[in-house]
Amino acid sequence: MLVQDHDRAGGYWGAVYAFCAVKGLQVVIDGPVGCENLPVTSVLHYTDALPPHELPIVVTGLGESEMSEGTEASMSRAWKVLDPALPAVVVTGSIAEMIGGGVTPQGTNIQRFLPRTIDEDQWEAADRAMTWIFSEFGMTKGRMPPEAKRPEGAKPRVNILGPMYGVFNMASDLHEIRRLVEGIGAEVNMVMPLGAHLAEMRHLVNADANIVMYREFGRGLAEVLGKPYLQAPIGVESTTAFLRRLGEILGLDPEPFIEREKHSTLKPVWDLWRSVTQDFFGTANFGIVATETYARGIRNYLEGDLGLPCAFAVARKRGSKTDNEAVRGLIRQHRPLVLMGSINEKIYLAELKAGHGPQPSFIAASFPGAAIRRATGTPVMGYAGATWLLQEVCNALFDALFHILPLGTEMDSAAATPTTLRRDFPWDADAQAALDRIVEEHPVLTRISAARALRDAAEKAALDAGAERVVRETVEALRGPGFGERKGENQ
């Protein structure tokens, strides 16, 4: 491909999204005019539904003169727009980094953070930014703040680390993790960075345990805080193990809550498992391309807990680039009945629509892409997430079945069935074998309709060419690019 498909932003984006989520902190972006338009004004509208100018951000607006004279003067001008009584942090873009920008002028309360956007990705910088916020505004000269003793009889306290802007489905997952914590009898001490105030950073040490919501970032701060920490769970079994371990750390009994959840939040899981869709679970394969948090968790739940066959699972990991061309090939080879991913995978899936048979269903599970999830009813984590995810998979299976039905408008516009097709039209053995291989790539649920459509198309192509029999080359031409490639191992 001539243009590389990106699946994450640079370090500058991650730092900005972390800093802007904290109350009481102003952000100066040291970059050219308009450098905030894409990450802040534009993208956050399509991911977090934030209106323009919602966040306390100002830009230095670098021009040609700053290339040789430095950025201190432009930074002083930008700082005067902000509230001088509030702390501010300057975040350097790639251009400012290349010319040695980000130097804070005298007489201002601006502190400097270097995102290293040239060599760090969004999640690496976000992880450092979270740790930096605590070390600069929670510690005193590098010393940990004193921990406030929990009053006798008070509930154990838990921090939730990771929620910030630009994270897929953050609101729903945060709501569910908070519900689980409170459900077993604990209370949330702080959510950081989203919604936390700069003046409260020292209170992070008051928690008895920490929950890191994402594998991509947040663990660095959890290590600094020095308290036991757990990864937020996805799936029924993982959530149960998570609650029991959290209860053990906090000295609480989670079993009454787990028992109540089985008869309430998790009831739809058992109902869906025993309903008519159970016939599809063993044959309806799925593929997922998402952050490591979602890719690992969702695959473990659907494949491990429920037994759905996984065609492939590709995790986007911090610090390493995803081979999107390989992902494209996996989608083409396996044609999963349900595909979860970002706009990249949605485009790759759309490229297959010229093929035969029903179209796979797509479920948004990752950025990049326009997907606003401000409502709290679409979790993937926790018990509620297990229910919602299985519900969406079942709906996706129904949608795949819908595509089998012929539309009246399509039937009217389609060419009439050729009367010259012969049911006894001879096929070469290797042509039949090629057809079988193509059909095997379709999910079991849709193989019958795909086989019929492919057979009719092959015989029509042979008749149109004046052939007396269907040969292998005719079938391969129907398959298009990628025919004959061996299926790769699941990632």
Curated annotation (Swiss-Prot):
InterPro entries found in the cross-reference section: BchZ, ChlB/BchB/BchZ, LI-POR_suB-like_C, Nase/OxRdtase_comp1, Protochlorophyllide_Rdtase
Biological processes, Gene Ontology terms: bacteriochlorophyll biosynthetic process; photosynthesis
Record's keyword terms, sorted: Bacteriochlorophyll biosynthesis, Chlorophyll biosynthesis, Oxidoreductase, Photosynthesis
Pathway: Porphyrin-containing compound metabolism; bacteriochlorophyll biosynthesis
Domain of life: Bacteria
Catalytic activity: 3-deacetyl-3-vinylbacteriochlorophyllide a + 2 oxidized [2Fe-2S]-[ferredoxin] + ADP + phosphate = chlorophyllide a + 2 reduced [2Fe-2S]-[ferredoxin] + ATP + H2O + H(+); bacteriochlorophyllide a + 2 oxidized [2Fe-2S]-[ferredoxin] + ADP + phosphate = 3-acetyl-3-devinylchlorophyllide a + 2 reduced [2Fe-2S]-[ferredoxin] + ATP + H2O + H(+); 3-deacetyl-3-(1-hydroxyethyl)bacteriochlorophyllide a + 2 oxidized [2Fe-2S]-[ferredoxin] + ADP + phosphate = 3-devinyl-3-(1-hydroxyethyl)chlorophyllide a + 2 reduced [2Fe-2S]-[ferredoxin] + ATP + H2O + H(+)
Keyword Oxidoreductase: yes
Enzyme Commission number(s) from the entry: 1.3.7.15
GO molecular function, one term: oxidoreductase activity, acting on iron-sulfur proteins as donors
Class of the enzyme per the UniProt entry, highest EC level: oxidoreductase
Purpose of the protein: Converts chlorophylls (Chl) into bacteriochlorophylls (BChl) by reducing ring B of the tetrapyrrole.
Complexes and interactors: Chlorophyllide reductase is composed of three subunits; BchX, BchY and BchZ. Forms a heterodimer of one BchY and one BchZ subunit.
NCBIfam families: BchZ
Entry's family note: Belongs to the ChlB/BchB/BchZ family.
Name of this chain's protein: Chlorophyllide reductase subunit Z
Species, as recorded: Cereibacter sphaeroides (strain ATCC 17023 / DSM 158 / JCM 6121 / CCUG 31486 / LMG 2827 / NBRC 12203 / NCIMB 8253 / ATH 2.4.1.) (Rhodobacter sphaeroides)
Source species taxonomy: Bacteria, Pseudomonadati, Pseudomonadota, Alphaproteobacteria, Rhodobacterales
